[in-house]
Amino acid sequence: MSARDIGASIRQRILNKSRNQGRPFQEVLQYFAMERFLYRLAKSPYSDRFVLKGALLLTAWRAPQSRPTMDIDLEGRVNNKLDHIKEVVGTVCEVDVEPDGIAFNRASIEVSRIKEDADYEGVRVQFHATLARARIPMQIDIGFGDVITPGPTDIEYPSLLDLPAPVLRA
């Protein structure tokens, strides 16, 4: 099957899932894209350098959520210089994995500092992905220096479709 056919097939499966679950297509598509980015992160040389946190961690725990999330929250155990983060995310975008129809656009990566208050500074990464010509905005917020208690453990993130699931730190 060609890359175009795989993308179209995956897109149709996501559309079917959204209809079956009564959820908006864009929401399910966004979750799929975030899941496949996490899968690439798990397969990358940086897999042990990031810890999943936030709303997607609640998804992994299958906890109820009040609203859908549109971004990935990570705790970074890497150099927090913007150029370095851009290189790391770009490397993850290009990790070779089993065909899943998603393409992450390394050239679209933009990084910026985020300041929630005087004691916290993180990095926001924005880029986009495509699936069968559908453009998917991606956002990752990376915090640094947070204490995680108890320490992080490996989890298997739930897969929307019958594709290999990400195994990552959380």
Where are these regions (language model features)?
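Compositionally biased terminal segments of proteins
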Residues: M1-A170
